């Protein structure tokens, strides 16, 4: 397995800090959390069950359909785009390595072990990363963070004291907007100044003059 890790760090050539976090943190057990700079954490993502995340293929198809132009652009779009690019590249290198190992290892048990490790362990981490950054680009980072916190609270609450259904990410923006509207004080548009009328005293003096 050490040979597998060595091959992975060599094959996964990562030019950016974000991608280096992915490789170094996973391979050598360093305390590096690729979600911290985005306000989340691995622990926060771990509240979501593994079957919550779509397959890598579905996530890659979603990223391609929604953000292909931005991902292929040489311009820097956002940190989420950069992280998404590197996660996609890393997964491609992992697949190449798994294919190479599967073709060159003579022992079927070892070959199956390596392929299974890539698909299960690394596959889940890639699925989490892809889902997080695609969701942040689609719904906004604050909404995704609110969803992760809401789901974490829901899943840790005993079934007898929580709603039957888990929170749904796609419904959070609407709820959030309604709640924010309720909090914000109603702004009153200033009315144009009216011309001040004459004081009663002045009007009274004018009436006396007219009587005279």
Curated annotation (Swiss-Prot):
Any Pfam family the entry gives: Hep_core_N
Annotated spans, Disordered: 165-212
Region (HBEAG): 25-27
KW Cell cycle (keyword) present: no
Comp. bias (Basic residues): 178-205
One cellular component (GO) term of this entry: host cell nucleus
SUPFAM superfamilies, A to Z: Hepatitis B viral capsid (hbcag) (SSF47852)
Gene3D superfamilies reported for this sequence: Viral capsid, core domain supefamily, Hepatitis B virus
Sequence repeats: 184-190, 191-198, 199-206
GO MF annotation terms: DNA binding; RNA binding; structural molecule activity
Tagged with keyword Repeat: yes
Role according to the record: May regulate immune response to the intracellular capsid in acting as a T-cell tolerogen, by having an immunoregulatory effect which prevents destruction of infected cells by cytotoxic T-cells. This immune regulation may predispose to chronicity during perinatal infections and prevent severe liver injury during adult infections.
Family classification: Belongs to the orthohepadnavirus precore antigen family.
HAMAP family noted in UniProt: HBV_HBEAG
Subunit annotation: Homodimerizes.
Stated name of the protein: External core antigen
Organism: Hepatitis B virus genotype B/C subtype adw (isolate Okinawa/pODW282/1998)
